[in-house]
């Protein structure tokens, strides 16, 4: 059994789910799966994937897990009570082979009852694929690479650089994920505990994975994902105001907690048009998840300065396909100018070699419809969108004044 706890997912699933319970309990949604690697054959493993999903749907939250969620100040008691009754239902998810060897995964049902599928299902697809295609995983190489990354992070002048694990969805396996996290905690240190230096804070800020945050005593991290702002396209008063609507509902729910705004659902230009002085003061910062991170950071800092908001009081979070090398480059460019956070995913949890011997799966599950209408993101990177309704995409670009990609 790959997934053994419903906490084995990202924190932002719970923070979004709480908003859904309180603000949008009747919303109906649809999600679709996509593997971006050309030629990857997942169809032979459909029965195995279905079996793992069946096991996932048998899980319930344990009392200790509910107590852990309840200990977070932004999680409300009625939401924890709801989770105490919660189970994922197999009737809302289908897995089917496609002629070319690919697979279709469709999740359709009430948003409140389907939101927790995405992360564990992606982790299942990954682990099933790799345990069938790599019978003898190159763990020695994975450990060597992890050692090299830690050495880079512990170089002189980087003592204040902190990284976080965002790698649940694309991990090689659950066991490897846990090993990586235990090594990072021991070698980099957490919070005020510096592991391998005489003094100073640790360099491991925490993990997006709630189960391992609980098990290892580190900070669980996350706020919102694209699906939240995409759903607001269908749930808000009018399309042009949907991003503002999403941020306002979020602020109403969390009253200053979880103040990181996601910036790339409509691209950075549209984000900055909506992210006015009110939101700049209300939110703690923003997260970059597509496009050029260096240009993004400079634009956001300039935006803060223009509105006379002190950038030093704001946090820039980088989380788009980060490597340790790229993280260090970003840290050197922005340190001292603002608060910084870095979420590293696949590069931490699925780096056991180089292609063709080992290549991580670029798998995603994205919301494509809400309340019967298409929803989409117009990210700052081509190829990151999932919407197949060209008319809706054209309309979205027009409404948010975004030029079509060449």
UniProtKB/Swiss-Prot annotation:
InterPro entries listed in its UniProt record: N/Namide_PRibTrfase, NAPRTase_N, Nic_PRibTrfase, Nic_PRibTrfase-Fam, Nicotinate_pribotase-like_C
Disulfide bonds, paired cysteine numbers: none
Modified residues (Phosphohistidine): 226
Keywords: Ligase, Phosphoprotein, Pyridine nucleotide biosynthesis
Modifications the protein undergoes after translation, according to the UniProt entry: Transiently phosphorylated on a His residue during the reaction cycle. Phosphorylation strongly increases the affinity for substrates and increases the rate of nicotinate D-ribonucleotide production. Dephosphorylation regenerates the low-affinity form of the enzyme, leading to product release.
Known catalytic reactions: nicotinate + 5-phospho-alpha-D-ribose 1-diphosphate + ATP + H2O = nicotinate beta-D-ribonucleotide + ADP + phosphate + diphosphate
One MF annotation (Gene Ontology) recorded for this entry: nicotinate phosphoribosyltransferase activity
A Gene Ontology cellular-component term: cytosol
Known pathway: Cofactor biosynthesis; NAD(+) biosynthesis; nicotinate D-ribonucleotide from nicotinate: step 1/1
Pfam family, one: NAPRTase_N
Name of the top EC class for this enzyme: ligase
Keyword S-adenosyl-L-methionine: no
Entry's Gene Ontology BP terms: NAD biosynthetic process via the salvage pathway
EC number from the UniProt entry: 6.3.4.21
Protein purpose: Catalyzes the synthesis of beta-nicotinate D-ribonucleotide from nicotinate and 5-phospho-D-ribose 1-phosphate at the expense of ATP.
NCBIfam families the UniProt entry points to: NAPRTase, PRK05321.1
Family as reported in the entry's similarity comment: Belongs to the NAPRTase family.
The protein's name in its UniProt record: Nicotinate phosphoribosyltransferase
Upper taxonomic lineage: Bacteria, Pseudomonadati, Pseudomonadota, Betaproteobacteria, Burkholderiales
């Amino acid at each position: 059994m790959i997934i053994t706890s419903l906490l084995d997912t990202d924190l932002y699933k719970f923070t979004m789910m709480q908003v859904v319970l309180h603000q949008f309990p009747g919303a109906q949604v649809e999600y679709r799966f996509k593997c971006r690697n050309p030629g990857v054959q997942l169809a032979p493993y459909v029965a195995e994937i279905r079996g793992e999903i069946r096991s996932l749907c048998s899980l319930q939250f344990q009392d200790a897990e509910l107590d852990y969620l309840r200990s977070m100040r932004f999680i409300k008691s009625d939401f924890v009570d709801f989770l105490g009754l919660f189970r994922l239902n197999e009737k809302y998810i289908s897995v089917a082979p496609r002629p070319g060897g690919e697979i279709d995964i469709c999740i359709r049902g009430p948003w409140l009852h389907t939101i927790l599928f995405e992360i564990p299902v992606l982790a299942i697809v990954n682990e099933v694929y790799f345990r069938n295609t790599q019978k003898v995983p190159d763990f020695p190489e994975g450990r060597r690479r992890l050692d090299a990354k830690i050495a880079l992070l512990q170089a002189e002048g980087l003592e204040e650089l902190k990284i976080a694990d965002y790698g649940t969805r694309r991990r090689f396996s659950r066991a490897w994920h846990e090993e990586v996290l235990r090594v990072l905690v021991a070698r980099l240190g957490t919070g005020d505990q510096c592991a391998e230096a005489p003094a100073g804070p640790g360099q491991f800020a925490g993990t997006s994975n709630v189960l391992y945050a609980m098990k290892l005593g580190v900070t669980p991290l996350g706020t919102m994902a694209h699906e939240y702002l995409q759903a607001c396209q269908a749930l808000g008063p009018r399309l042009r105001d949907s991003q503002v609507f999403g941020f306002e509902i979020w602020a109403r729910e969390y009253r200053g907690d979880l103040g990181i705004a996601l910036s790339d659902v409509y691209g950075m230009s549209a984000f900055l048009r909506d992210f006015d002085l009110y939101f700049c003061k209300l939110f703690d910062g923003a997260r970059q998840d597509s496009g050029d991170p260096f240009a993004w950071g400079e634009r956001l800092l300039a935006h803060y300065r223009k509105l006379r908001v002190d950038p030093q009081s704001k946090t820039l979070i980088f989380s788009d396909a980060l490597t340790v090398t790229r993280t260090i480059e970003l840290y050197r460019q922005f340190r001292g100018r603002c608060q910084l956070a870095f979420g590293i995913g696949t590069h931490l949890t699925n780096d056991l070699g180089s292609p063709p011997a080992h290549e991580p799966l670029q798998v995603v599950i994205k919301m494509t419809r809400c309340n019967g209408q298409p929803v989409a993101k117009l990210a700052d990177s081509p190829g990151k969108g999932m919407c197949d309704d060209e008319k809706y995409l054209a309309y979205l670009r027009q409404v948010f004044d975004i030029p079509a990609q060449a």
